[in-house]
Amino acid sequence: MPSSSPSMDESRRSAVPPKEPAGRICTVCSDRANGYNFGVLTCESCKAFFRRNASKHKEIKCPFSDSCQITSASRKFCQACRLNKCFAVGMNSEWLNDLKPKSSIVSGKFKRKKPDMKNNLKVEVDDTEEDLENDDEEQISVPKALLEKLINKANEKSKDRCTCKCQCGFYPITQRLTAYEPKDTTAVNSPQDISFSHHLHHSDSFYSSSTSTLSPMSVISCAPSSHDSSGYNTSQLVTQSPTNYTVSPASIPSSITELSPQMPSQYPPMLSPFQFGVMAQMAAPANFLNFPPMPERTWTPIQAVSTVPVTETLPPNLLEQIHSKIDKYIGVLNEDEITLLEELHVQNEPLNAPLIQWHNPKSIDGVFRIIEEALRRIVNMACQLSLFRELHVDDRKNLLKSGFGELLIVRGLMAYDKSDNSWNHSFGVRGKMEVKVEVLKNPKLEEHYKAHMNLLSTFGEDVRNNEHLMLIFNAAVIFHPHVSNLRDSKRVHSTQAKYFQMLLKLLTFEYGKSRADIAYSNLLNQVVELHRVNRTLLRVFYGLDIAQLDPLIRELCSFE
């Protein structure tokens, strides 16, 4: 007597597929679908994801609020919400169990592909890597030819030199490319950094030759020595030797004198726009950022940022408030320096304005939208500084492209609230958006989370809470003299020297000579640490879907 309930195979044969939407869109992530998988129209990625994780439904937990928006760009950020959506749209895990014993079908699949196996080895490797993603339990079957290829590759003797030739035309065809082994590997944070250093060894035209092995003091060669806070001369500061730099003993009990951990002597060089693109290809998945070389183009996104002086739109009472803040430094700073400090406060006011649009601070997507709006304001602020506008347009481009991440991080230091471990942003008239640092606790962001937490914990609280000092420090970060391909690096040196000179004068005025010396040394160390945190931030940007990024960020990262 037949069973009252049809078998799984019978139900699958008799089931009539629902009408497909136009364009075959994945019902889970809205990516392009390839067919019906487990009863639902999905893409290949969601099919593989469901096959790997359907049995782990109770084990995977959402690190946020179980309400993450799942799109083709954000689907990798939260496995729990993605799996919940798979079940919600009707994907059936029973079909998964029914498919596993059918090894003959799998064997037949590879058998049919055997004639083209040699030509499709690369495709098969890519497919195998995708199947292995987040999978340490299932058994994987691979074609024999592919297995032999992988074994032979693993047993290959490593070459002692590179015989590659440049194909893009950047180097002469006769240029011999060789691997580069850094002398001090302590400055390299990960295997990705090592390969990145190897790949960029010959890009001398993009690095300043003086950035190979530098200590914090020699990195900022234009910074005044802390033991001499009188009679500054900018032209002397630019060429001042760092060997005479001394600080007072670190026994003074104050939060401002807390020195950061000992920094390695090698300084991570700033990345040029060309090196941004190379790093993107090496740090991100191949299917994310496999783009042709960036063509020459005009600087439209950054040029489009408003350049109307903020002073024309500020109310008079706000200018009076700024003057009242900085009047105490009259006599400490000279007239030109007072003008520069006033300008920093004026240009900083738009950054204090509430955000225009609400974004969910508990989701990764919302956090990146906040970052996009903040970056737009930060770039606008930098473009309006008088000393910045005196530079050649190419130097302005290179400084912004190389330093936008560091400016964002410094702005985050100013907005950070240590009491509840969050960044606070105002919204509307009395609204507030509080972004918890914990939102960065994500497998994709783990490296940046650790580096950022180290910076937050070692940055002096007294300095971080002093708006005058942070604005000057922020300006000094903008004018980084070791950015490659600068037309007038001496002008950038001297400009940064002015801001470091102001910084040391204010530290001495606020805290006294001894404490100022130690605080100043700590800030120079933090500049080096800032570059390391910036590298981890860039890797986060390179792992995102560029189609979802703001045009300004795409331009800054040389994605287009």
From Swiss-Prot:
Gene Ontology cellular component annotations, sorted alphabetically: nucleus
Gene: nhr-8
One Pfam family this sequence matches: Hormone_recep
GO molecular function, one term: zinc ion binding
Function: Orphan nuclear receptor.
Superkingdom in the source lineage: Eukaryota
Protein name, UniProt field: Nuclear hormone receptor family member nhr-8
Organism this protein belongs to: Caenorhabditis elegans
Annotated ranges, domain NR LBD: 336-560
Source taxonomy: Eukaryota, Metazoa, Ecdysozoa, Nematoda, Chromadorea
Entry keyword set: DNA-binding, Metal-binding, Nucleus, Receptor, Transcription, Transcription regulation, Zinc, Zinc-finger
Compartment list: Nucleus
GO terms classed as biological process: cell differentiation; cholesterol homeostasis; intracellular receptor signaling pathway; negative regulation of transcription by RNA polymerase II; positive regulation of transcription by RNA polymerase II
